[in-house]
Amino acid sequence: QFFNRMNIVLFDEPKIKTSLLPFTFTRPVAEIRVGIFTIADKWRRIANSQVSFLTDEYLSKKFASKNSGDNYIINGALLPDEKIFQAIAKLEKGEALVKEGLLLAVRADFLPFYEEIDSFFTEYSIEEY
């Protein structure tokens, strides 16, 4: 498993978060259930790792982010499968994975503030998925 020692942080993409209201008033996007598991549960299972969240400040006390020197920051609305898991695992620090203009994941050595999420990734090397 690629992520055993990696830090996985599931972020709320602002437009997706807004489109999923009222569910996302009380939880991050990745804590919404899809079937019997939440999206975060699915990431925990495929990565065999714990996850944390990058979300609005008022939710961050209950759903905190864990920062390390090597972070996989993944769109919380992204449902994991083996193909996307492999693509994210191949990212080098400073690389981002994007599909049709939507940020899927980035590998970074620090976490942005949630309010800066839209502008944080503009300096990264982009790979189209």
Residue ranges of model-derived segments:
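Terminal amphipathic alpha-helical/low-complexity segments used for targeting or macromolecular assembly
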Residues: 5-129
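Cationic, low-complexity basic patches in intrinsically disordered or flexible, solvent-exposed regions
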Residues: 2
